[in-house]
Amino acid sequence: MHAPSEIRLTFNQDRPQSNEDDGSGLAVQEAKPILQAPPMYKVVLFNDDYTPMDFVVEVLETFFSLNRELATKIMLTVHTEGRAVCGLFTRDIAETKAMQVNQYARESQHPLLCEIEKDG
């Protein structure tokens, strides 16, 4: 018959193996850091006396994927209150959208201004 073989399980691969058992048999896992949501930024459109309302609606539909009704509502807010929030995004996305809107407005020879503001 065969002699019984000894099976040794190692739970912690980080420590070097030794022939002596310390009795713990447990691996210690480091605590994971608590993740926080990134700060959000508002993309804001400002009113001017020269940009046509239809162009503002087009910008809102194109760059913010808004439907015609919501785009028109935001455009009217820009027109009557002087400014309106188009969306809330992380910083990189907000900066990119504002840059794209400003570039498109300049290429179309309109003075429409779009900026970002930290939310909160």
Swiss-Prot record:
Oligomeric form and interacting partners: Binds to the N-terminal domain of the chaperone ClpA.
Classification via InterPro entries: ClpS, ClpS_core, Ribosomal_bL12_C/ClpS-like
Can you name this protein? ATP-dependent Clp protease adapter protein ClpS
Any matching Pfam family: ClpS
The task this protein performs is described as: Involved in the modulation of the specificity of the ClpAP-mediated ATP-dependent protein degradation.
Name the species this protein comes from: Pseudomonas putida (strain ATCC 47054 / DSM 6125 / CFBP 8728 / NCIMB 11950 / KT2440)
For this entry, list what GO says about its biological process.
Answer: protein catabolic process; proteolysis
Which NCBIfam families does this UniProt record tie to the protein? PRK00033.1-2, PRK00033.1-5
Q: Where is this region: Disordered?
A: 1-27
Q: What family name appears in the similarity comment?
A: Belongs to the ClpS family.
Organism domain of life: Bacteria
